Amino acid sequence: GEDVEQHLRVRLGIDVAAVGLEHLLAQRLGLVLGGDGSVLRAADFVRGHNVPLLAVNLGHVGFLAESERTDLHRTVQAIASESYVVIERMALDVVVLVEGREVARTWALNEASVEKSHRERMLEVVVSVDNSPLTAFGCDGVVLATPTGSTAYAFSGGGPVVWPSVEALLCVPISAHALFTRPLVVGPRSTIGVDVLTRTRETGVLWCDGRRTVELPPQARIEVSRSAEPVRLARLNPTPFAERLVRKFRLPTDGWRGPVTAQERAGVLHAVETVEPRHAGPRPD
């Protein structure tokens, strides 16, 4: 916005100018001003070009952002002095096949979601892992996510929060019409498949990061696997992921009885450290 541009020009003495994509891809770092949606859009441009992204949150939660708008001065100084570290976040390769023929190929940083395109009917799907059918059910959709995406759409659908250091793929059914359908976490070398059955009658739609769409006719198959091209993010002050969760989601760390005192917390830690490990001995007959 104009206020950010003015801040860069007047207070920091940085000239702002529109440049082409070729110029952006030649830089050592890309600064993103916005929320998580802006990060996902920027990742479209820089993925595969080794350009890390550093985001300043101008939105709401800004889970992928590294700093807030009030820290813009400090952020620019850190960039100028290259006082940051670069981490890699796993991405997904997404392939759509119809009758065995590839009709679309795309990718996702957060998630690929298979959804119904009409509210009147459910999707009928079969979920498979490494070409082995696992379960079939009717649903509003299926979210296939990365650990990065575990705090986004998959989280809203009841999926687990997965630490970014864990390499895994998530499968989270949305409003499944089944008794025992639960979210799945599979290994990073696996391929998750979702087949849209002909009994669905209506088309579905594939959404990747809420941005890229592909229409899914009955008999379409979606295959998701780990991508060889991660997305690189810059971090100014790497903090434990648990702290980021608490700060971004404003999680309550106090029980209903009130704040936990430092003395109580120290007592719990001391008790954990002094517990002797139990060794399994022979079982009695």
Sequence positions of predicted segments:
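N-terminal glycine-rich "phosphate-gripper" loop used for MgATP/nucleotide binding
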Residues: 32-36, 43-44
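Gly/Ser-rich helix-loop-strand patches that form or flank binding pockets
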Residues: 45-56
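Gly/Ser/Thr-rich active-site loops/lids in small-molecule metabolic enzymes
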Residues: 135-180
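Short Gly/Thr/Asp-enriched flexible loops that form oxyanion-binding sites at enzyme active sites
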Residues: 41-47, 154-158
